[in-house]
Amino acid sequence: MRARIDIINGLIDENGYKSYLEIGLGDGTHFNAVKAEQKIGVDPAYPNEGNIYGAESDTFFVANTQSFDLIFIDGLHHSRQVERDIVNSWKCLNKGGTILIHDIKPK
């Protein structure tokens, strides 16, 4: 089975994706290994710094004006939050882009 970062970087390479959004950074290892030219990370556990937004995803999406080629959702795993992240991600996804969802905790 391919590792998450291999899948993400493979999609970037295969599709020529330039911009990447990651919701939920964990320890930041995967985010730092992403090869996209432009990348934004969103996680309330981090401070606002550089390309990292230290906020909940709902707050980020209200203020966001950018669009992305690839969006990886791995924030809160509650089904309602993931649903909001999908809806909000769809609104800022470039044509021909991809949304990846890591996992969801039903109810």
Feature locations, PLM:
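A short alpha-helical cap/connector motif
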Residues: 1-72, 76-107
